[in-house]
Design a protein with these regions (language model features):
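Short beta-strand segments at enzyme active-site cores
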Residues: 53-58, 126-130, 250-251, 378-381
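Loop/helix patches that line or flank the sugar-binding groove of alpha-linked glycan CAZymes
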Residues: 2, 17, 64, 79-82, ...
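Short, polar loop/linker segments at the starts of domains and inter-domain junctions
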Residues: 17-36, 353-357, 523-534
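Solvent-exposed beta-strand/loop surfaces of large extracellular or lumenal domains
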Residues: 248, 510-532
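Short, flexible loop/turn elements at secondary-structure junctions
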Residues: 11-13, 60, 98-101, 132-134, ...
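Alpha-amylase-like alpha-glycosidases and glucanotransferases acting on alpha-linked glucans and related
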Residues: 1-2, 6, 10, 90-91, ...
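C-terminal beta-strand-rich structural cap/linker in extracellular carbohydrate-active enzymes
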Residues: 5, 525-549
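N-terminal structural segment of carbohydrate-active enzymes
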Residues: 1-125, 133-135, 140-144, 151-156, ...
Length: 549
């Protein structure tokens, strides 16, 4: 099976060169990317990175401060919308797409369907968000109104298994901040499990929690027989998008929805669309196996684990031996873990809040991409060192690329402009782009990376604190991977125990010529049981030495 490489894109920001970047600017001022920007040439360029799947973030229609009433879409109250553009995770119609992304909003679904077709024709698969835990406070589907959430709820009950929301009967919403006159009565529970009619500014106040039959005020008891109405609605939504040839769903905050629902709904979807993949955003390692073995997820975020460890090694001087402990915690489910260093929730590697320099992400990226056969993901702009240090508006200067505002991201525009002219990229950006292209392409072309076994060398190399070493092998293809998390060039001596040869079923060994696949250079080393490989690795860099035995 080919290794999955996911390229996440915040769709509204992709190659948007139409605006002037006014903080808190409107659509008219700052512009917005369109489905049509993803031309066959543009998609071919994305695939050239080694991409197999594109996660188009922010496809579903969500709350916004932009007026689309002329297209039959009700306005959202500005007091409960984060940013002028709005959060992609405050969905207001599960059956529709964001009109911002269409050249002609009246034809927005047809334009989306054409994007699906172009993506597939480019040899790529499409992933979109499924946001099951919460919806925008003013959710209303103008496409499927007969299935609207809350339409048949008993609003005089705090909880009923057949209600879609949780209510505070006869109690108005009273946030702890100014919502500019927005009224909601009875108040609904807020999306981040805030069971109070008075959410704070730090809560997900723009959303309401969906009810899957769990009585949160009654010892969290589950009432799943008969099937809760929300389950049925959500199954129908997933089937709607699967029928449009979407290849996978990244499921937002999956742990906030009962695993019993996932077990049922994933089975329902895969019965009709067995090829569709489900990726869970999860942060509780104690629940990982339940969401795989019971829930049926194909892949889970490896955030609390590998991501946190790699960030700590990169930024805080943590020993590289901690990487071993991180993968050992999920060794039995390693193939189900999605590795990454950036996404829309996390701070950019090059930001002042992370490493401060994009090149310092190289060794961590080697580990994330090459440690095993499981999927890896990068976030658009990561490959040229986007810093995420703009103050776009609602988001502020926080090291992240905004998901709330209309904006134009300079590095991405210089990378993915309509002419595909990369002459405006700096030498450092060009070099980093080449690194990512080479690394991610190797994940497909080298069988040892796409299908081979993994052997961690750190237990036999206690002296390595700022370097991490492992072997990948498939038959006679052997790769020695080295990551240097140091400001200094490392002259490393890596001991290769006989156990590695036995486990990887290698024979022979001795002096050989090894080729560094990342830069296409050769060096002579000794690779033999119970001997040491001596080589040098540049500061904040890495090597993949291909060894012929």
């Amino acid at each position: 099976m080919d290794k999955i490489v996911i390229y996440q894109i915040l769709t509204r920001l992709f190659a948007n060169t139409t605006g002037v970047n006014v903080p808190n600017g409107t659509l008219a001022q700052n512009g917005c990317a369109k489905f049509s920007y993803f031309t066959p040439r543009m998609l071919a360029e994305i695939k050239k990175l080694g991409t197999t799947h594109v996660w188009y973030t922010g496809i579903l229609e969500h709350a916004t401060q932009t007026d689309y009433t002329r297209y039959g879409i009700d306005n959202d109250h500005a007091g409960i919308v984060k940013g002028k553009a709005g959060s992609p995770y405050a969905v207001r119609d599960y059956y529709d797409v964001d009109p911002d992304l269409a050249d002609n909003p009246a034809n927005r679904m047809q334009e989306f369907e054409k994007l699906v077709a172009r993506t597939h024709k480019a040899g790529l698969k499409m992933i979109i968000d499924f946001v099951p835990n919460h919806v925008a406070r003013q959710y209303h589907s103008d496409v499927k109104p007969e299935t609207d959430f809350g339409r048949h709820d008993r609003t005089d009950w705090h909880f009923s298994p057949q209600n879609n929301f949780y209510y505070y009967p006869h109690t108005p919403l009273a946030p702890q901040f100014d919502v500019q006159g927005y009224c909601e009565c009875p108040a609904k529970a807020t999306g981040n499990d805030c069971f109070s009619p008075a959410p704070s500014h730090n809560d997900w106040y723009e959303t309401v929690k969906l009810n899957y039959g769990v009585d949160y005020t009654g010892d969290h008891a589950g009432h799943f027989d008969p099937l809760p109405d929300t389950w049925i609605k959500m199954r129908d939504i997933l089937l709607f998008w699967a029928a449009k040839n979407v290849d996978g769903f990244r499921c937002d905050m999956a742990e906030m929805v009962p695993v019993e629902f996932w077990q049922w709904v994933i089975g329902e979807v895969k019965r009709l669309f067995p090829q569709v993949i489900f990726i869970a955003e999860v942060y509780n390692p104690a629940q990982y196996r339940s969401y795989i073995h019971t829930g049926g997820f194909d892949y889970l975020y490896d955030k609390v684990g590998l991501y946190d460890t790699l960030r700590s090694v990169t930024c805080y001087g943590t020993s590289a031996h901690q990487i071993t402990q991180a993968w050992q915690q999920v060794s039995d489910i390693q193939g189900n873990m999605l590795n990454f260093l950036e996404n829309h929730d996390e701070q950019r590697i090059a930001s002042d809040f992370f490493a401060g320099q994009a090149d310092k992400g190289r060794p961590a990226m080697l580990v994330a991409a090459c440690m095993n056969t499981n999927p890896v993901m990068i976030y658009f702009g990561q490959e040229v060192g986007e810093r995420g240090m703009d103050a776009e508006g609602f988001s502020g200067r926080d090291g992240r690329t905004t998901i709330f505002d209309y904006w134009s991201v300079d590095s991405i525009n210089r990378l993915y402009n309509k002419q595909l002219d990369k002459s405006r990229l700096s030498d450092d950006e060009q070099n980093l782009l080449q690194f990512y292209r080479t690394l991610l392409t190797l994940c497909h072309t080298e069988r040892a990376l796409s299908n081979g076994r993994f052997f961690d060398l750190m237990y036999a190399n206690g002296h390595l604190q700022r370097q991490y070493a492992f072997v990948r092998a498939d038959g006679h293809e052997v790769l020695l991977c080295l990551a240097n998390f140091s400001d200094e060039q490392a002259c490393v001596s890596v001991f290769v125990p006989r156990h590695a040869f036995d486990y990887l079923q290698l024979s022979g060994g001795g002096a050989c010529v090894a080729r560094d696949l990342l830069v296409n250079t050769q060096e002579t080393i000794r690779f033999a049981p119970d001997e040491s490989v001596v080589t040098t690795v540049a500061p904040w860099n890495c090597k993949i030495l291909k060894i012929s035995l």
